[in-house]
Amino acid sequence: MRVAILRITERSWEINTMLPWKSSKKFSNHSIASTSKWLVHQVANFVTWHETAKKCGAKIRVLPILDNWLIDENVLISTLSEKTKLVALNFVSNVTGTEQPIKRLIQLIRKHSHALVLVDAAQAISHIKIDLQDLDADFLAFSAHKIYGPNGLGVLTGKLTALSQLQPLFFGGKMVERVSNNRITFAELPYRLEAGTPNIAGVIGFNAVLDWLQKWDFTAAEQHAISLAESVKVRRNF
């Protein structure tokens, strides 16, 4: 796994413009899967892939949401094929608080396609302890401010094999290893994705937050949140 610190606060969704098929019409018969019902979906996610599909000629396959706000797994399976390039999933809704069974969904995607999997963990990152290796997503993204950090930092983590497919979006210092009049050699991952002077103050502040979070009991915090939700249900007779 590698972690890239980016200056985009919308959870590093600009990876859509770093994928090699971002503007190639040869993917006109391929698809990108995403979830429906804007109440459940993060707008930054959906809009990003909608625009990408228009540029590269791909089709967006929208996954329906059941009455319990979970993705319809049967439709997910029927949507997947060898032409599915990527599936973008929301871990937790920023409106309903619904937590998708993200690990099971990824397992289904692996079983029925070769698609890349991108997880929006913005709303989950401060409430759920996430094991990246166990989750098996190709990409996972969130903003630092979603986990008590400073504004202005987008975090993109992923498998080395997946990140290696990304092409730099911005260009500048730090991202290069060697420069000559005729050739530029980009630095290794993740540095090739971190062009220009970084948000130094933000990174230092976020590092302090991460040190503090090492002492955080995510399991206890998650159980407390569940307890509060159950209490609300009882009081409002849901």
UniProtKB/Swiss-Prot annotation:
Keywords, alphabetical: Pyridoxal phosphate
Pfam families: Aminotran_5 (PF00266)
Superkingdom, natural source: Bacteria
Modification type N6-(pyridoxal phosphate)lysine: residues: K146
Record Gene3D superfamilies: Type I PLP-dependent aspartate aminotransferase-like (Major domain)
InterPro entries xrefs: Aminotrans_V_dom (IPR000192), PyrdxlP-dep_Trfase (IPR015424), PyrdxlP-dep_Trfase_major (IPR015421)
Family affiliation: Belongs to the class-V pyridoxal-phosphate-dependent aminotransferase family. Csd subfamily.
Name of this protein: Putative csd-like protein HI_1343
Source species: Haemophilus influenzae (strain ATCC 51907 / DSM 11121 / KW20 / Rd)
